[in-house]
Amino acid sequence: MKTLPTLLLLCVALCSAYPLDGASRDADTTNMDLLQQYLENYYNLEKDVKQFVKRKDSSPVVKKIQEMQKFLGLEVTGKLDSNTLEVIRKPRCGVPDVGHFSTFPGTPKWTKTHLTYRIVNYTPDLPRDAVDAAIEKALKVWEEVTPLTFSRKYEGEADIMISFGVREHGDFIPFDGPGNVLAHAYAPGPGINGDAHFDDDEQWTKDTTGTNLFLVAAHELGHSLGLFHSANPEALMYPVYNAFTDLARFRLSQDDVDGIQSLYGPAPASPDNSGVPMEPVPPGSGTPVMCDPDLSFDAISTLRGEILFFKDRYFWRKSLRILEPEFHLISSFWPSLPSAVDAAYEVISRDTVFIFKGTQFWAIRGNEVQAGYPRSIHTLGFPSTIRKIDAAISDKERKKTYFFVEDKYWRFDEKRQSLEPGFPRHIAEDFPGINPKIDAVFEAFGFFYFFSGSSQSEFDPNAKKVTHVLKSNSWFQC
């Protein structure tokens, strides 16, 4: 319940701006309550009331209104004018406000540059893969401008635990239903610190028809990394939700970049190669050309947030931080791996990439081939008639790996470590529109990308349809 002194102070601040007679009385009372709640939640009104009353040289409410207006980039009037009322009615982050790009008090930050995250539960508003893609994209926003990297955990504790909840949801800071507070997050540290919570009473969307999950997640994860709110209306870390119309062209403002780099420094000029000597790529007619319109790939896999495109003795290493991919000999990273590999895929939960050539396969972690490899593909359960794998992909959400051989495919259960019964099945049955001659495949942003010759097909595994057809080397900005 609001205290009488506070209500009287609110009346002093507001009566001159809004007459309290007739039909406007109820609306004015509602606006006053909204303002008081806003100042208490985001500008520490109750904490400072006694201090201001003792001084008796200004109204704490008027001063707080001025502080709020200045921070939000409004005209500083000290009154609840129409522009101020419009802003405080908008949906926003639940974390309190401070000025310019800011970090939490004491400047908490992670003491390591590789962080883990876990999506604890899901909103029913979106398919799971759409939630996964939004969170992954939100993390990439910060990864691109810092040395930070992220990997996902599917069980146990992660540095950043991401969850959806309504009202009272376990942290003593309840949500308020649809609108107003969209989400909140905690500064870096152990336990609940670093975690991000999203109000599931909101209508979460992939576009701007409701509340865009990617935009809110990118903002909240900024808090999880140590940033507080910015007074710059162009910044992602501005507290009031701003629905960008062109999500495909979204970029951090310089204010956001300055803030996060004040904590972690800039992104490295190129990915860290962990001391592996780089063998120069020899020139010659046999060297594949990145923007060759007829370029095809032998295999493609992700590796710790990067994408590896294999071709003959070489591979391109594509980081989302850098437009230009690196080009290396396979032997410069993994001397014992063969050239012209057949298939490759990453199991993120095991931090392992598997490479296939003929009837053998290898397991690599980072720059090291694991002991006990190569092994026969028949140890995975394939019949002896299978002599090579054309392409493979591991679905991180379903924890299934798909192996494509000619016009059929097998499915492997990563939990049970065995091929599933009922396979093989024809590719055309479950992947309509996909050329059965598959050279390579990998997953990104909730889609499967199938490569056949010089073209690729973006496939939605939930809708079971091809959504785009592109050139194979479009990932190289060709």
From Swiss-Prot:
Question: What Gene3D superfamilies would the database entry show?
Answer: Collagenase (Catalytic Domain), Hemopexin-like domain
Q: Which GO terms describe its biological process?
A: cellular response to amino acid stimulus; cellular response to reactive oxygen species; cellular response to UV-A; collagen catabolic process; extracellular matrix organization; innate immune response; negative regulation of phosphatidylinositol 3-kinase/protein kinase B signal transduction; negative regulation of reactive oxygen species metabolic process
Q: Which residues bind Ca(2+) 4?
A: D298, D390, D439
What CDD domains does this protein's entry cite?
Answer: HX, ZnMc_MMP
Provide the E.C. number(s) assigned to this enzyme: 3.4.24.17
Its chief place of residence is secreted
Residues annotated to bind Ca(2+) 3: D176, G177, G179, V181, D199, E202
- Domain of life, per UniProt, equals Eukaryota
- Where would you find this protein in the cell? Secreted, Extracellular space, Extracellular matrix
Is this entry keyworded Transferase? no
Record Pfam families? Hemopexin, Peptidase_M10, PG_binding_1
Q: Does the record's keyword annotation contain Hydrolase? A: yes
State the name under which the record lists this protein. Answer: Stromelysin-1
- Say which species the protein is native to: Oryctolagus cuniculus (Rabbit)
From the UniProt record, report the name of the gene that encodes this protein.
MMP3
